[in-house]
């Protein structure tokens, strides 16, 4: 063996090389795992236990608070030290920590389970030039439906129970992505309108089929503060309502398949 070798095919330089990469990737992994806890943390357990970093120090699980400057003004600091203030209308099915949670009211309206949403800012998402990002076609007049595609305006919306829930009156377009995000619905038997995320729509030539919720549940779709704009939180609330319907629209959906 030559000088510095520990074995026939292993020497100190090779060990140092391996150790160097082990240290580098360990540090990177620990840093990334701590940084990804800036959203969704601190954890709140069903019985109300909250894990917060100490004021004068730091625990391994949570990073120090960091302030980010937003592109269109304002700042946000995460992780935030204030606990969740919303009342969760859920009850444990048993008396031990970790037992399943069951809705105690209307889970779609109460925003629990798959119908839950993050409390994002009540501000309108903006394009790079500061315009409202998601708006109806009546506002974004420079956008149109591609030639040959179905124009859903005027088509009926049929819900999961086979009942007509209303009529499509407009489409909402993402100005940045050049993609339609929502259909605007005039709810049957009501003076109000509601948005439907396009991902929950089966667009046919003569109708729009929405299987996630029942016709009567369109009346409780979260309302918007503005007729022509939607905030970040409202985006989540609307999508969460339809997502929750996949499990909670009927009692049978929440039961097991077997």
Swiss-Prot record:
The keyword DNA-binding does not apply. Residues 1-11 are periplasmic. The chain crosses the membrane at residues 12-30. GO terms for cellular component: plasma membrane light-harvesting complex; plasma membrane-derived chromatophore membrane. The keyword Manganese does not apply. It comes from the Bacteria. Its cofactor is a bacteriochlorophyll; a bacteriopheophytin; Fe cation; Mg(2+). Pfam families: PRC, PRCH. The modification N-formylmethionine is found at residue 1. Keywords: Bacteriochlorophyll, Chlorophyll, Chromophore, Electron transport, Formylation, Membrane, Photosynthesis, Reaction center, Transmembrane, Transmembrane helix, Transport. Belongs to the reaction center PuhA family. This is Reaction center protein H chain.
């Amino acid at each position: 063996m030559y000088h510095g070798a520990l074995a026939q095919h292993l020497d100190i330089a090779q060990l140092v090389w391996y150790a160097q990469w082990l240290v580098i990737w360990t540090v990177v992994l620990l840093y990334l795992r701590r940084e990804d806890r800036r959203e969704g943390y601190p954890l709140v357990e069903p019985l109300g236990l909250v894990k917060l970093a100490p004021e004068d120090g730091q625990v391994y699980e949570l990073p120090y608070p960091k302030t980010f400057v937003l592109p269109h003004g304002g700042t946000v600091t995460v992780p935030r030290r204030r606990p969740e203030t919303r009342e969760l209308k859920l009850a444990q099915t048993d008396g031990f920590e970790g037992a399943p949670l069951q809705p105690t009211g209307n889970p779609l309206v109460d925003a629990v389970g798959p119908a839950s949403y993050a409390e994002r800012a009540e501000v309108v998402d903006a394009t790079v030039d500061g315009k409202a990002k998601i708006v109806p076609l009546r506002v974004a007049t420079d956008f149109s439906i591609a030639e040959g595609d179905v124009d859903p305006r005027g088509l009926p919306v049929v819900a999961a129970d086979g009942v007509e829930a209303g009529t499509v009156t407009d489409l909402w377009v993402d100005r940045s992505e050049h993609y339609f995000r929502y259909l605007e619905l005039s709810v049957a038997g009501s003076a109000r309108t509601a948005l439907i995320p396009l991902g929950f729509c089966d667009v046919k030539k003569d109708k729009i089929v929405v299987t996630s919720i029942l016709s009567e549940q369109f009346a409780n779709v979260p309302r918007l503060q503005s007729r022509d704009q939607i905030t970040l939180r409202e985006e989540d609330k609307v999508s969460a309502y339809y997502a929750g319907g996949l499990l909670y629209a009927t009692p049978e959906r929440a039961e097991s398949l077997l």
